[in-house]
Amino acid sequence: MRFFHSRTCPPLPGKLWSRQPRRNGATNMSEHQLDHRAGVIAAVVPCYRERASILDVLEKIGAEVSHIIVVDDACPDGTGEWVRSECADPRLTVVTHTANQGVGGATLSGYTKAIELGADIIVKLDGDGQMNPEMISRLVRPILEGRADYAKGNRFFRLQGISGMPKMRLVGNVILSFASKVSSGYWKIFDPTNGFTAIHVKVAKILPLDQIDKSFFFESDMLYHLNVNRAVVADVPIDAIYGDETSHLKISRILLPFAWKHLNNLVNRLIINYLFRDFSFASVQLLVGMVLIAFGTIFGGINWYESVSTGIVAVTGVIVLAALTFSFGAILLLGFLNHDIQNQPQRPLYPDL
């Protein structure tokens, strides 16, 4: 990859590309004002075929952001070069990939560059215009106030905010949200695929960035890695913006890969959190419950098959044994599930790092 810094360029056609009003805090500080001394904020904007919208997005990024990092993920339309030639913002840095790495790979490259630039908080927003840069102040506030290590947008807080969401996308988000709750352990977090996120740099540094998924599963995989590191995640209400942009995410292509990745993360999370990091009564509930359910299912299934094959009704004791072991195992797993829901990280990591 290559790094470019912006040069002084002509303003956008028909628009005054001026940062002065925003640096005076009159426009983009939204309804909340941030203490700039609290942290240096870098905004990472991954791009792939977003030449039509990227400049409008960059123009709306306010003075609370010290660095703007545009990552050209080998765009066939040369988005990075376009931004470099048209944007005169002195905060701009362009990172160019020679090969496409996916939205996760582009975001991680932006993280790396933001760390090099000395950022304290890294915000990620897409270049398609669906995320309002004027909400950056709201997004980073839980981190600046020491209430969270990672903050993410949630489009489902306000029902009127999702009225414009396409129906298939709405259904898909509900399904993916539940799957992410199970696999990541953040049971109170919703809208996991939302790409409007912020993370404290100290937390980003302890994550295995080279192991995080680089595809569209990136946001969900981030939640898994944050949980096994016991990071606090906050949901921030945001409004979604839907236009005529084309989504690169195809449900038919991600259904099975996402299901497998969620299952893999679930198994790894349970092993790490309940066997390696801690072994408690909840661990016993999990292990014994799984064994009893497996025994009840297999034992009952074998005897049911023999009964059907031979025409001889299984004895009452066999039926009761299979039912009791399965039921007791289910009770234990429900107890474990209740513990897991309550076991979300509560104390932010970064103040102690």
Model-derived regions, located:
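Hydrophobic helical membrane-anchoring modules
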Residues: 2-3, 24-36, 212-213, 217-353
